[in-house]
């Protein structure tokens, strides 16, 4: 099955090669380097990256699944779920941040914007405070008397679970 999918994905390439044609923009974009991704990442209180050109890849958690972004990524708009964003810099450094929620926009010009509701570096997280918060959120969920209170407690618990995973598996 996988072989059939792989063969079918090459059909367009083979047709274009035989006819001497190319996809518009493919050659132009293939010459671009990692420095061509302009990356901005901010929360209401902190700007982590502002149109940074030293980023070669960003890995993000979204409600439609986790995915990596490289230069020339297809344009996309996604909603962030609680989790870890990993920024791979051109010099080989990887920086990790926890985000509670937010949005990510990838534009056709390889610019990427992440706007987080809340964000911090992983070293700012306190394991004990996370465990206490998770216990309180679980108790709030059990004692919630309205749908709104249940939803609020459920969201808090989901965020604390993601925080705990970030601390346990950086």
Name each model feature, range by range.
Residues 1-36:
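N-terminal mitochondrial targeting presequence
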Residues 3, 11, 71-80, 149-154, ...:
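Generic hydrophobic segment detector
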Residues 40-132, 136:
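Compact, glycine-rich, soluble single-domain proteins
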Residues 120-170:
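Acidic/glycine-rich phosphate/pyrophosphate-binding loops and surrounding catalytic core
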